[in-house]
Amino acid sequence: MADGDKTIEISLDRSRIDLEYCYDFIAASYWAAGRTRGEFDRSVEMSFPLGAYCDGRQVGFARVVSDQIAIAYVADVFVDPDYRRMGIAAKMIDALHNHPELKRVKRWLLATADMQPLYRLHGYADLDDMMMMRLDEDARNRDPLR
Protein backbone atom coordinates (compact mmCIF):
# COMPACT_ATOMS: atom_id res chain seq x y z
CA MET A 1 0.00 0.00 0.00
CA ALA A 2 1.47 3.34 -0.94
CA ASP A 3 0.44 6.81 0.16
CA GLY A 4 2.44 9.31 -1.87
CA ASP A 5 6.03 8.24 -1.51
CA LYS A 6 5.48 6.32 1.73
CA THR A 7 4.69 2.61 2.01
CA ILE A 8 2.26 1.81 4.82
CA GLU A 9 2.00 -1.71 6.23
CA ILE A 10 -0.57 -2.92 8.76
CA SER A 11 0.56 -5.96 10.75
CA LEU A 12 -1.22 -8.19 13.27
CA ASP A 13 2.14 -9.56 14.43
CA ARG A 14 2.31 -8.58 18.09
CA SER A 15 6.05 -9.32 18.22
CA ARG A 16 6.66 -6.31 15.93
CA ILE A 17 4.93 -3.82 18.22
CA ASP A 18 7.32 -1.30 19.75
CA LEU A 19 5.82 -1.32 23.24
CA GLU A 20 7.97 1.55 24.49
CA TYR A 21 6.97 3.81 21.58
CA CYS A 22 3.29 2.91 21.97
CA TYR A 23 3.32 3.35 25.74
CA ASP A 24 4.95 6.78 25.48
CA PHE A 25 2.21 7.93 23.12
CA ILE A 26 -0.70 6.37 24.98
CA ALA A 27 0.45 7.47 28.45
CA ALA A 28 0.30 11.08 27.21
CA SER A 29 -3.12 10.69 25.57
CA TYR A 30 -6.34 12.19 26.90
CA TRP A 31 -7.91 8.74 27.26
CA ALA A 32 -5.11 6.95 29.14
CA ALA A 33 -3.18 9.61 31.02
CA GLY A 34 -1.71 8.03 34.12
CA ARG A 35 -1.79 4.45 32.85
CA THR A 36 1.35 2.69 34.09
CA ARG A 37 3.70 0.76 31.83
CA GLY A 38 2.66 -2.47 33.56
CA GLU A 39 -1.00 -1.70 32.93
CA PHE A 40 -0.29 -0.91 29.29
CA ASP A 41 1.74 -4.09 28.77
CA ARG A 42 -1.03 -6.16 30.36
CA SER A 43 -3.69 -4.50 28.21
CA VAL A 44 -1.74 -5.37 25.05
CA GLU A 45 -1.15 -8.92 26.24
CA MET A 46 -4.87 -9.45 26.88
CA SER A 47 -6.09 -8.04 23.57
CA PHE A 48 -5.71 -8.26 19.80
CA PRO A 49 -3.17 -5.55 18.90
CA LEU A 50 -1.93 -4.37 15.55
CA GLY A 51 0.69 -1.94 14.36
CA ALA A 52 1.01 0.40 11.40
CA TYR A 53 4.47 0.76 9.90
CA CYS A 54 6.02 3.14 7.40
CA ASP A 55 9.23 1.88 5.86
CA GLY A 56 9.65 -0.45 8.85
CA ARG A 57 9.10 2.22 11.54
CA GLN A 58 6.00 1.97 13.73
CA VAL A 59 3.68 4.93 13.16
CA GLY A 60 0.36 3.67 14.54
CA PHE A 61 -1.28 1.27 16.95
CA ALA A 62 -4.71 -0.07 17.82
CA ARG A 63 -6.09 -2.97 19.81
CA VAL A 64 -9.35 -4.81 20.43
CA VAL A 65 -10.62 -6.45 23.60
CA SER A 66 -13.07 -9.22 22.71
CA ASP A 67 -14.69 -12.53 23.55
CA GLN A 68 -14.45 -13.21 19.78
CA ILE A 69 -18.21 -13.78 19.44
CA ALA A 70 -20.55 -11.25 21.02
CA ILE A 71 -18.53 -8.09 21.54
CA ALA A 72 -15.35 -6.26 20.61
CA TYR A 73 -14.11 -3.01 22.13
CA VAL A 74 -11.69 -0.94 20.04
CA ALA A 75 -9.11 0.83 22.19
CA ASP A 76 -5.91 2.87 22.14
CA VAL A 77 -6.06 3.84 18.47
CA PHE A 78 -3.40 6.35 17.50
CA VAL A 79 -1.35 7.51 14.52
CA ASP A 80 1.92 9.40 14.92
CA PRO A 81 1.23 13.12 14.26
CA ASP A 82 3.81 13.15 11.43
CA TYR A 83 1.85 10.43 9.59
CA ARG A 84 -1.72 11.63 9.96
CA ARG A 85 -4.05 12.41 7.05
CA MET A 86 -2.65 9.44 5.10
CA GLY A 87 -5.53 7.02 5.77
CA ILE A 88 -3.56 4.99 8.31
CA ALA A 89 -6.26 5.01 10.99
CA ALA A 90 -8.83 3.85 8.43
CA LYS A 91 -6.52 1.01 7.35
CA MET A 92 -6.04 -0.03 10.98
CA ILE A 93 -9.80 -0.07 11.61
CA ASP A 94 -10.36 -2.14 8.45
CA ALA A 95 -7.66 -4.57 9.57
CA LEU A 96 -9.28 -4.95 13.00
CA HIS A 97 -12.68 -5.62 11.42
CA ASN A 98 -11.08 -8.25 9.17
CA HIS A 99 -8.94 -9.86 11.89
CA PRO A 100 -9.31 -13.64 11.47
CA GLU A 101 -10.04 -14.12 15.20
CA LEU A 102 -12.74 -11.43 15.21
CA LYS A 103 -14.76 -12.31 12.10
CA ARG A 104 -17.75 -13.61 14.13
CA VAL A 105 -18.09 -10.55 16.39
CA LYS A 106 -21.50 -8.91 16.15
CA ARG A 107 -21.15 -5.78 18.31
CA TRP A 108 -18.19 -3.45 18.02
CA LEU A 109 -17.89 -0.60 20.54
CA LEU A 110 -15.49 2.26 21.14
CA ALA A 111 -15.23 5.58 22.90
CA THR A 112 -13.72 8.68 21.32
CA ALA A 113 -13.82 12.39 22.03
CA ASP A 114 -12.67 13.53 18.61
CA MET A 115 -12.70 10.91 15.84
CA GLN A 116 -16.42 10.20 15.40
CA PRO A 117 -16.38 11.08 11.66
CA LEU A 118 -13.73 8.42 10.96
CA TYR A 119 -15.62 5.72 12.82
CA ARG A 120 -18.94 6.64 11.23
CA LEU A 121 -17.33 5.96 7.84
CA HIS A 122 -16.62 2.43 9.12
CA GLY A 123 -20.18 1.69 10.17
CA TYR A 124 -20.18 2.97 13.75
CA ALA A 125 -23.23 4.87 14.96
CA ASP A 126 -23.75 7.06 17.98
CA LEU A 127 -25.31 4.99 20.78
CA ASP A 128 -29.03 5.19 21.29
CA ASP A 129 -31.17 4.68 24.35
CA MET A 130 -30.68 0.90 24.25
CA MET A 131 -27.00 0.87 25.12
CA MET A 132 -25.70 1.45 28.63
CA MET A 133 -22.24 1.73 30.12
CA ARG A 134 -20.92 1.74 33.67
CA LEU A 135 -17.86 3.81 34.49
CA ASP A 136 -16.06 2.92 37.72
CA GLU A 137 -14.40 6.18 38.74
CA ASP A 138 -12.76 4.46 41.73
CA ALA A 139 -10.75 2.17 39.43
CA ARG A 140 -8.08 4.83 39.03
CA ASN A 141 -7.55 4.88 42.82
CA ARG A 142 -6.67 1.20 43.05
CA ASP A 143 -3.08 0.00 43.20
CA PRO A 144 -1.61 0.05 39.67
CA LEU A 145 0.17 -2.84 38.01
CA ARG A 146 3.90 -2.22 37.85
Please provide the spans of the model-predicted regions.
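Acidic/histidine-enriched, beta-strand-rich ligand/metal-binding domains
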Residues: 75, 82-84, 102, 118
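Conserved acyl-CoA
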Residues: 91-106
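Conserved active-site alpha-helix within GNAT-family acetyltransferase domains
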Residues: 102-137
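A conserved beta-strand-loop-helix scaffold within acyl/acetyltransferase catalytic domains
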Residues: 38-78
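Conserved acetyl-CoA pyrophosphate-binding loop and the N-cap/start of the following alpha-helix
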Residues: 83-92
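Short amphipathic alpha-helix that is part of the acyltransferase structural core
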Residues: 1-35, 130, 145-146
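Acidic/histidine-enriched, glycine/proline-rich intrinsically disordered or flexible terminal extensions
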Residues: 138-146
